[in-house]
UniProtKB/Swiss-Prot annotation:
Keywords (A to Z) from UniProt: Cell inner membrane, Cell membrane, Membrane, Transferase, Transmembrane, Transmembrane helix
Coiled-coil residue spans: none
Protein's UniProt name: Phosphatidylglycerol--prolipoprotein diacylglyceryl transferase
InterPro entries: Lgt (IPR001640)
Biological process annotations from GO: lipoprotein biosynthetic process
Membrane keyword on record: yes
Pathway: Protein modification; lipoprotein biosynthesis (diacylglyceryl transfer)
Gene: lgt
Family: Belongs to the Lgt family.
Record carries keyword tRNA-binding: no
């Protein structure tokens, strides 16, 4: 443990332990609880939005309370399985190939947002087709509550002392006790919680209620992934980059262009396509 008194900035509050409570071999982690809170909040929020029929195209919400409850299980599977496989296959395949038992250790952290997005997208498409639901309206529905969960999980990243930021001298810099160098760093997890999470949630709520964005299916989903991609790109500037794949490092070494930025580019492009499609089709009723 680093010397608490040697920190030239705000010392990390060490009463924040990644484990909330442990009973023998069973432990409850903040990280896992964060995902549960995010999923349950989204489930609740979707039901609240579904009750306001005037918000929706043709006054017809794609999910009622029963279907929302059915989908939450598939959403959870998409997030967890997709997020973990994304971490394994997109970010660090070499490590997990050499340590296969670590693949299932979700409680230790290591979930890819982009993998979780792919997993959730697959779940949405499958569920929408099975229940004859407009896929774009379904995307909008799930996107509306997603940022809140992202914000909660980013706070859990802070508690876990992972994905910290670069060295800085800003007044709110934090010295993380798990940092071997024990240097003042940007609390980039909290930046992400704000930008990718809670502020984005407010922006989506604003366009839903003020501009009736649900009446143009695809608008909310498009705004979500554009905004997330931009926020993630900005946060990468302040964050210590994760170890990029070797092929990517060889191409962009020293450029400042990170793998996280590269993964966000197609999201932004697809988001613009979704919004263009929504307005081109002149939905609204």
């Amino acid at each position: 443990m680093n010397n608490f008194l040697s920190c030239p900035a705000i010392p990390f509050p060490n009463f924040l332990d990644p484990i909330i409570i442990q009973l023998g071999p069973i432990a409850l982690h903040w990280y896992g609880l964060g995902y549960v809170v995010g999923i349950l909040f989204s489930w609740w929020y979707v039901q609240k939005l579904s009750h306001k029929k005037s918000l929706w195209y043709a006054n017809y919400p794609p999910l009622n309370a029963e279907k929302a409850s059915d989908f939450v299980v598939w959403a959870a599977l998409g997030i967890v399985v997709g997020g973990r496989l994304g971490q394994v296959l997109i970010w660090d395949p070499t490590y997990y190939f050499n340590h296969p038992s670590s693949i299932i250790a979700v409680w230790d952290g290591g979930m890819s947002f982009h993998g979780g997005l792919i997993g959730t997208t697959i779940a949405i498409i499958w569920f929408a087709r099975k229940h004859n639901i407009n896929i774009w309206a379904m995307f909008d529905t799930i996107a509306a509550g997603a940022p809140f969960g992202i914000g909660v999980v980013r706070i859990c990243n802070f508690i876990n002392q992972e994905l910290w930021g670069s060295v800085t001298n800003v007044p709110w810099a934090v010295c993380f006790s798990l940092d071997p160098q024990y240097l003042p760093r940007h609390p980039s997890q909290l930046y992400e919680a704000l930008m990718e999470g809670f502020l984005l949630f407010i922006v989506l709520a604003f366009i839903i209620f003020a501009f009736k964005a649900f009446k143009r299916p695809g608008t909310v989903a498009g705004t979500f992934i554009i905004s997330y991609g931009i926020a993630r790109t900005i946060s990468e500037i302040f964050r210590v980059p994760q170890e990029d794949p070797e092929w990517f490092s060889a191409l962009f070494h020293g450029s400042g262009f990170t793998y996280g930025m590269a993964l966000s580019l197609p999201m932004i492009l697809f988001g613009f396509y979704a919004i263009f499609r929504a307005f081109r089709n002149h939905f609204i009723k």
